[in-house]
């Protein structure tokens, strides 16, 4: 259970649940009645919903890859034929879960998630699932052009960068990559799918400004903004991720030999919280003094 505290002014929320099934924002408001979430709950919900995030970015003029939101399978097939490769994404999720690279093999639309490739079959409803050797997938369909270049040796994925944004600054950058690309699903560059991290010491001013515009567009004071660029195009925003009760930003880059305090994302976030305390006049938090036992209604 969560202890009642009325002396807490700010909360930094990470994934958690209420065993009773009540919406977490309601639970936290009942336990911490004076507290504000450093990342507002509406921002957490927005960034958890990839289609809603995409619409917000487009509305604010933030550059993104060509994107299709549709219920029509014919639209998906036409989109893939036009771009050769595309990524089909679950509307909600993280760590690359539900991502499939799409392409045509002869006349068959194929989908590869990095572990296996399946013929894609569109169905009317139900969750995505493997039936036999086929992937059954129901609408809505959220599809993005796979950004890269065609070389003599084949398709080459663009450079995927992550901007770690804290209060309108980008203290450091990372890149996700693979040493080898053996199958279309390897173009899903997520650490949970076997990709690697490395730090990037400098980026263009345009890339930095694009990342900051994306964070501002969704209202995020702290965010990890994923972008892709090639020698001919970009930067384009892929996603905006925030720490939330739905998910948290990956910190496994702390295991890199090159890691230094400067790359400590949590340290930058803590400094932002302290600055907020100083500018708003919030008092330093102390442990709550013991209260006399009172009968309180139980929350369910």
Q: Which residues are covered by each model-predicted region?
A:
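Conserved N-proximal alpha/beta basic substrate-recognition cap immediately N-terminal to
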Residues: 1-78
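Short glycine-rich anion-binding loops that position phosphate/pyrophosphate groups of nucleotides
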Residues: 16-19, 91-93, 243
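Short, surface-exposed coil-to-beta transition loops
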Residues: 23, 157-160, 222
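Hydrophobic alpha-helical segments and helix pairs
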Residues: 54-108
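Protein kinase-like catalytic core scaffold
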Residues: 86, 141-142, 171-172, 223, ...
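Phosphate-binding site of ATP-dependent enzymes
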Residues: 104-206
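C-terminal active-site "lid" helix and adjoining low-complexity regulatory extension at the edge
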Residues: 198-202, 216, 220, 229-300
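A conserved acidic, glycine/proline-rich C-terminal tail/linker
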Residues: 211-214
């Amino acid at each position: 259970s969560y202890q009642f505290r009325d002396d807490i002014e700010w909360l930094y929320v990470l994934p958690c649940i209420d065993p009773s099934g009540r919406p977490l924002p309601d639970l936290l408001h009942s336990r911490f009645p004076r507290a504000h979430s450093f990342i507002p709950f509406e921002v957490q919900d927005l960034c958890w919903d990839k289609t809603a995030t995409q619409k917000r970015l487009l509305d604010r003029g933030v550059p993104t890859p060509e994107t299709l939101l549709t219920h029509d399978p014919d639209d998906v097939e036409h989109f893939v034929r036009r771009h050769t490769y595309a990524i089909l994404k679950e509307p909600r999720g993280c760590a690359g879960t539900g991502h499939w690279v799409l392409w045509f093999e002869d006349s068959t639309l194929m989908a590869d998630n990095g572990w296996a490739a399946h013929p894609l079959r569109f169905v009317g409803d139900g969750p995505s699932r493997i039936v036999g050797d086929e992937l059954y997938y129901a609408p809505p369909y959220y599809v993005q052009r796979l950004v890269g270049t065609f070389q003599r040796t084949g398709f080459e994925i663009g450079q995927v960068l992550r901007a770690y944004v804290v209060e309108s600054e980008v203290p450091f950058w990372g890149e996700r990559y693979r040493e080898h690309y053996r199958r279309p699903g390897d173009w899903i560059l997520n650490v949970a799918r076997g990709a690697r991290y490395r730090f990037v010491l400098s980026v263009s001013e345009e890339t930095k400004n694009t990342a900051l515009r994306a964070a501002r567009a969704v209202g995020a004071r702290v965010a990890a903004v994923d972008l892709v660029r090639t020698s001919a195009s970009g930067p384009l925003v892929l996603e905006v991720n925030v720490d939330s009760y739905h998910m948290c930003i990956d910190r496994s880059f702390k295991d890199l030999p090159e890691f230094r305090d400067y790359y400590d994302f949590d340290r930058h976030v803590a400094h932002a919280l302290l600055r907020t305390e100083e500018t708003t006049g919030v008092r330093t938090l102390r442990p709550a003094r013991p209260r006399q036992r009172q009968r309180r209604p139980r929350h369910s």
